[in-house]
Amino acid sequence: MQIRTYQVDGYTPGVDYPIYNTVPFGLAFTCGGKLPGYYADPEARCQVWHWCLPNGRQFSFLCPNGTVFSQTTRVCDWWFKVDCQDSPRLYGNNDELYRDVNGNKI
């Protein structure tokens, strides 16, 4: 299997941005005590994101190489457009997922 890496001029893959080909084993992130929703994982430089269900169950996913999970938009975006280290401060954004158009909790 060939693994593609995407070079961005002036930057080094794996140094300036992550290039995992699988979700790394042993990440410390857990869904315990968190709202259901989507969470960037700074330990994996945000190339990994986690989906936390209401029952605490966790699923982990990998953004394509050259992209990382944006906690602001809750999608994978180009690595240079995301402040990964700021992600934990934005975890509360998941509360928006469970509100109606008027801002009432559903």
What are these language model-derived features?
Residues 1-106:
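Extracellular secretome segments
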